[in-house]
């Protein structure tokens, strides 16, 4: 393999918005990384159904279409 063509692979501390912190390796070039959701709080891994809305999309949808009548 040719030397010095690959990015550096360093340890990164990842912090989730739920408070979970773990260390992994990455080529991102940062020592710390913040994420919105991880395996500790994601509904698929926890088995709990909840709405994950980080940008207010659900509230925006309900505001826009919440007053509509249901048609059968």
Curated annotation (Swiss-Prot):
Its cofactor is Zn(2+). Binds 1 zinc ion per subunit. GO terms for biological process: translation. It comes from the Bacteria. GO terms for molecular function: metal ion binding; rRNA binding; structural constituent of ribosome. Zn(2+) binds at residues 16, 18, 38, 41. Pfam families: Ribosomal_L31. Keywords: Metal-binding, Ribonucleoprotein, Ribosomal protein, RNA-binding, rRNA-binding, Zinc. GO terms for cellular component: ribonucleoprotein complex; ribosome. InterPro entries: Ribosomal_bL28/bL31-like_sf, Ribosomal_bL31, Ribosomal_bL31_A, Ribosomal_bL31_sf. Binds the 23S rRNA. PANTHER family: 50S RIBOSOMAL PROTEIN L31, CHLOROPLASTIC, LARGE RIBOSOMAL SUBUNIT PROTEIN BL31A. Belongs to the bacterial ribosomal protein bL31 family. Type A subfamily. Part of the 50S ribosomal subunit. This is Large ribosomal subunit protein bL31. The gene is rpmE.
